[in-house]
Amino acid sequence: LDPQVSYTGRRNFVNTYEASGTYHLTGEKQITGRDFQTGDSFTFQVTGEEDAPMPDKVDADGKLTIEPTSGKTAALDFGTMTFDHAGTYTYQVTEESKDANGVISDSTEYTVKVTVKDANDGTLTANAEITGGEGDAVVFTNVYAPGAAALDGNANLKVTKELTGGSRGWKEGDSFTFTL
């Protein structure tokens, strides 16, 4: 057998290589001091740097809202990021602060650095390093402290200073400095 190929005119052959891979971003929401209850709502923000693909369960602004109604923990499922080329992708994950009804929000800012490597077989492998909190996972813990209030803006504060001991007494021009 002697195969021969002949062409009329010029022929171009273009080889393409496409690879893809995914990483699923999850976390946990915790509350201490009480259980979650009907009406609780927590919003989280995912911000990707440069051309980082966003997780598929956040909205167009990178936000995810959950409304747990019981228990002390709730799953956070930000969704899957789909990558089409190797590289390092960095994300910031935060909880929007809305201290209310004695619940104090967690202000931790997590950095999720996803390293995507090409396996040269049409697949990409993605591994994440999570920093910012305690451990290697995204965990936001709110604290319920009845009667606690987060002050924002102006607030009235009444303070009384009592001078005791000795016979010196309070004199005109005396002053004290208080630091809150």
Language-model features: where?
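Solvent-exposed loop/turn and edge beta-strand elements of beta-rich ligand-binding domains
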Residues: 1-180
